[in-house]
Amino acid sequence: MIEHAEVLQRGDDSGNEMLVRFRLPSGLEIFGLPTKNFYGGHWDLGPTWNYAVLSDRPFLVDAGRFGQGKKLVAMLEKIGITAADLDFVLISHGHEDHDGGLAELVDATCLNVKAHAIYGRLIKTYPAKSPTADKKDFPAKCWHCPMPETFYTQNCLEYHNVLQGLKIDPIGNGANEIGPDIRTAHLPGHSPDCLAVRLGDEAIIVGDIILPDISPWPTRKSLFNEVAAVIDPPYTDAAAIFGLRCYIRSLKKLIKIASDAPGLLVLPAHRFYYHGRWNPVDLENRAKELLAHHIARCGAIIDILKNGAKTAEEIAAAHFEKDLLEGYGSIMAANEIVSHCELLIESGDVVAVNGNAYAATGSMQFETDIQEEI
C-alpha cells in the first residue's frame, strides 16, 4: 500500500475504475483518477492516472485518452468534485493518453487549460509547413509520429481536430506558476513539452517522465527538424528539448529534486497500481535505475554492432524480445534504438553509414558522457 493512500473504490488488477485519495501531512488532498487506455499486450501501459489536486487553487492534471473526458467528469462527481470546484486543468504533455479527453472535458466543464508553451504550438495545424503532404491536416505534434498513415488517419484525426480550438495558457519555465508552494518543472526528453508538478516538499506529479515498472520512451533528437518551423523562436536548440541526452538531463534534475526534498510522494501516470499491487516510486533510486537502463542499452547496441553495421530495425530485432516486436511494437522499438544511436554518435562510439545503418567505431565513451551530462 502507498503511504497516505485511501482506496475509495476498488478497480481491476490494472487499476481501471479505481478512486484513490492521498491525504498529505499538511492536509493537502490529491485524488487519483485512472482512466482506461486501449493499449495492450507487452507494450501495455495500464490506465492513465489523472490527479485532482485540492490546493488553494484546485486543479486537475491530465484528461485521459480520447473519449475519456466525460468519464473523468463522472469520476470527479463520484468523489464530490464538480467543475465549479476546479480552477483549471494542466496537461503534463501532449500525448494522446494524457490530452485525448481534454476537448471533451473542457466542453463539459469550461475549465481553463494550462500546459507548456510548446504544447500550445504543437496542437495547431500548419498546412504550409507540414513536412509531408499526408500530414498537412494534422497538427505539428503529429508530424513526428512514427506510426504508419493507416494508423493515424483511422485513430487520430478526430482527436487532433477537436483540440484545435482550445486556448492554452502557457505555464512552466517560471512563467504563470500556480502558487508559491506548487511549481512546475519543464523536464523534456520523453516529449518536448513534459511538465512535472511539485507540491511543496510533499509530493510530485511526474506524468510519464518517470514511471515504475517500465521505462519511458525517449524522443529522437532529429524530430526537432520536423517541428522547428513552428517552435523556433524561441526554441532553437534541438538538444534542449528532444533526444535521449535531453531525457537524461531531466532524470538528473529529478535526482536533484529528490535530494532537496527526500521522501516526496511520487505520483506517476502509469503502472502506479498494476497486476493487483501498488508500485511505489523512490524518486532518486528510480531515476538512477533508468540512467543505468539507458547506459546498459547503449552498451548492448555497441555489442550488437561488433558483428557489422546494422539498421535500427536490425538492431531492434537483435536486442528486443520477439513478442515486443509484434505489430506496432517493431516501430516503437526501432524509434528507441535510433534515440540511443543518436547519443552514441555524439559520443563518437557509433557512426551512421549507408544512409540508414549504424556501425561501431571501437570506442566506449558513452558512459562517461552520460555520467558527466548536466
List each model region and its residues.
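Active-site HxH/HxHxD metal-binding segment of metal-dependent hydrolases
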Residues: 65-70, 77-178, 210-212
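Conserved beta-strand hairpin/beta-sheet module of binuclear metal-dependent hydrolase folds
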Residues: 17-83, 196-213
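Divalent metal-coordination and catalytic microenvironments
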Residues: 53, 62, 72, 93, ...
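C-terminal regulatory/interaction regions
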Residues: 2-7, 12-15, 299-374
